[in-house]
Amino acid sequence: MTDLIGFYSDHKIAAPLAIAQRSAKFKPFAAEIARRGILQIATCARLEFYGEKSVLEDIDGKPFFGFSYGRVEGAISIAERLATIAAGVHSQILGEGFISGQLMQAIESGDPNLSIFKVARVAVDLGSAARKRQEFFAEFDYVQIVEDIIADRFSDKAPLDRIYIIGAGMLGQELIRGNVGERFRSTVVITRNPKKLRKRLNTGPKTNVTFMRPSEVGRTREPGSMVVIATTDVDNKYKAILQETLLRLGPRIILDLSSIPVLTREAIGELDYVNMYGDEFLRFIEQNNQRLAPKLPLVVSDIKAALGAAV
């Protein structure tokens, strides 16, 4: 397993938006890359490849053209990096819990008998355990961010309309389960295929959730509404449809939680638009990271000790 190597770039090395855009280009090829015996980690904040040196020789640097990137060699060094990623040490939001699930999805797409996937599975378990032992948990999550922005933007006594959620992947489902629409008249999930999505989410908790196509939204203006964008699965055609829909609706605020902003401030006119790269969102991250920074060396030491005991 000493022939294992890895190449990586993340938000610490390159501009976060640039990484998100490059990562998005590789996501559709995840299954194909996994079949080649390569562990690909393509998230909004990182693009990484791990595997046998003989398999990765022709990849060295190519996915990172125009970017700075790092290289790691050997099973132990790779396990340490993957474990610290799983613990949230390398996340933009320190201590966030999404990344371990994303890692497991990537691992499960590969051959469990290959060395790299065995190493990665152990690393995720060690990193997740260290995160729990050191209580390295983000002070807030996306549900909390949405709730804080609701409290700020809807502090008056004006009646609320509906909250609209675009996207029902991991993040969209978390927002629904977190009941962020509690203060609103109802929660609406905007989707191009209501029937399919309704069936997929049917096993979740019973909440006041309805499903609507974009064409059904905005038939009357709702100045007391809020829109949360929780997906990156938006091509140019769908983006134009959503833009037209939101201009008709006229919500009080549009909160874009996608790693690649779906809209621009110019496109939505005078509507209040907040995305993950704006000062308001970055303040949430800064406050969380300042609180958790003293725990970083403790988590890393914990992981190194656990790795030492495991080999």
From Swiss-Prot:
* Native species: Rhizobium meliloti
What does the UniProt function comment say about this protein?
A: Responsible for the nodulation efficiency and competitive ability of strain GR4 on alfalfa roots.
| Gene behind this protein | nfe2
Write the record's keywords in alphabetical order, separated by commas.
Nodulation, Plasmid
| This protein's record includes keyword Metal-binding | no
An annotated GO BP? tetrapyrrole biosynthetic process
Name the chain's protein.
Protein nfe2
GO terms for molecular function, please? glutamyl-tRNA reductase activity; NADP binding
Keyword DNA repair in record: no
